Amino acid sequence: MLVVEDCPHLEQARRDLESSLRTGIIETPIQLIFVSSLDDAEFLGFQGSPTIRVNGDDVVPQPALPVGLACRVYRDTDGGTIGSPPIESIRAAIDSHRRARLEEFQREEAAKVAEFARAADTAESSSESERKSSEG
């Protein structure tokens, strides 16, 4: 979570993020970064406080929003303005990240199983060839 010092919406954003993270099995730490200069804001692509990112991705991407040291305004589900990311956006970003990680894990495990099966087939073929050659 990226914020400017004295951000009036920090606590609400933190509560919503903590609540969203508790829906998972694994405890995930929250990294709080205070952005204190325009140089830092530009380096981080900081578009206002508070900004929540999951695995580096903004939970409410707004490419047209300028970089700077300012409060950030969000839209709620009714179209009104709020001072922190909507909890639905936070949860959706976390769920998307978890699904992507799970799919990556499943692909890696499937590759390991396939490699193990190939190695077992190779070993079995080698043993069978040796047996036939000793019989012949």
Positions of PLM-derived features:
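Non-globular targeting/processing and membrane-anchoring segments
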Residues: 2-47, 51-136
